[in-house]
């Protein structure tokens, strides 16, 4: 698996998809095979999304690192993730923000909450908290956040998330219909979001009050 992992890294570096060296270090450090179902472990480093539980998926590695690059993560940051899934993305962010940082990862599906927590424990990630809640309304208890990442498709950017984002903070979120979305990177400037489009994607739909 190490060979396949390094092939992905070389591809990202050559294409310029990833420039933040901390993302590469985190990808090397965190074992994706811990976050997939046992029957898919041999495919852990194929550049594809894989099924997990409850009809959900773990995103393809290139999509994951592209979103992390857009977040402009730094050590010590306070992060909110909407849609913990298997916990893999949260694990990478936990490594990047380091011991002085914190990741709050919300997940609305109870079975996935248990799955993510088990996987994070297995990987030795201690600065990620997985919460069973409706992430479409955010998580006030951990706010305000330096960065917010939404890993499911949303009809729009929920105002609650904007309110929980620090001034100067960044949110990355796929926005659109259930069958196709535009990945948005938005920076909070003077209380409002300044948006940038990062391309077209297809994510699983967001569940909850502001989901589908």
Feature map (PLM): residue ranges:
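Class I SAM-dependent transferase core
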Residues: 1-84, 88-96, 112-129, 189-212
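Conserved nucleotide-cofactor-binding alpha/beta core module
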Residues: 72-194
């Amino acid at each position: 698996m190490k060979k396949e992992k390094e092939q992905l890294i070389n591809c990202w570096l050559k294409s310029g998809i990833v420039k933040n060296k901390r993302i590469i270090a985190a990808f090397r450090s965190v074992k994706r095979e811990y976050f997939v179902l046992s029957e898919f472990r041999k495919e852990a480093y194929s550049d594809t999304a894989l099924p997990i539980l409850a009809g959900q998926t773990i995103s393809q590695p290139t999509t994951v690192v592209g979103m992390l690059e857009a977040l402009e993560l730094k050590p010590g940051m306070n992060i909110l993730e909407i849609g913990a899934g298997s916990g893999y993305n949260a694990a990478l962010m936990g490594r990047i923000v380091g011991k002085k940082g914190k990741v709050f990862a919300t997940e609305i599906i109870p079975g996935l909450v248990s799955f993510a927590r088990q996987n994070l424990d297995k990987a030795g990630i201690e600065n990620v908290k997985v919460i069973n809640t409706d992430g479409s309304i955010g998580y006030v208890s951990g706010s305000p956040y330096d960065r917010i990442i939404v890993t499911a498709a949303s009809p729009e950017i929920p105002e609650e998330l904007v309110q929980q984002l620090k001034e100067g903070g960044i949110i990355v979120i796929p926005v659109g219909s259930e069958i196709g979305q535009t990945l948005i990177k938005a920076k909070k400037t003077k209380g409002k979001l300044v948006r940038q489009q990062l391309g077209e994607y297809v994510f699983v739909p967001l569940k909850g009050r502001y989901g589908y």
